[in-house]
Amino acid sequence: MKLLTIFLLCAMTFPLSAQNKLEVTIQGVKSEKGSVLIALYDSEGSFMKKHIASRKVKVADKNLTVVFDNLKPGNYAVSTFHDENENEKLDSNFFGVPKELYGFSNNAKGSFGPPSFDKARVTVDRDKKITIDLR
């Protein structure tokens, strides 16, 4: 009985983190070639360098939806691109301008490169849905 009481007191002292999901809808796929790659980041330091989760979805429609489950409350950012030629990289021209459609959470835009984590940041403190328009 004492053990049960101690366990219950400890359990009430350390509440469990809620696990949330982020539903991401990608709009504006122009062709049915290739796949759409989606990456999820959880910090400014890892943004565009090391994702914590990713999805690769074969294109079957102009819009698609993916879900990232079991997310702890916090700030996240999403990047995505339509990999038409299936080489798993965002192709660009001689000047570094992307040749394939791409997008970020909050439809954030960068100047001469990707936006900052801050511009793309999405706070997930409950289940959330976002939409990214490819450009």
Residue ranges and their predicted role:
Residues 1-21:
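Bacterial Sec-dependent N-terminal signal peptides
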Residues 20-29, 132:
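A short, amphipathic beta-strand motif
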Residues 26-33, 43:
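Structural motif
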Residues 31, 72-73, 124:
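Surface-exposed loops/turns
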Residues 62, 67, 72-75:
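A glycine-anchored, Pro-Gly-centered beta-turn/N-cap motif
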Residues 76-80:
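A short tyrosine-centered beta-strand micro-motif
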Residues 86-90:
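Acidic, glycine-anchored loop motifs typical of Ca2+
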Residues 100-135:
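Extracellular beta-sheet/turn segments enriched in Thr/Pro/Gly and aliphatic residues
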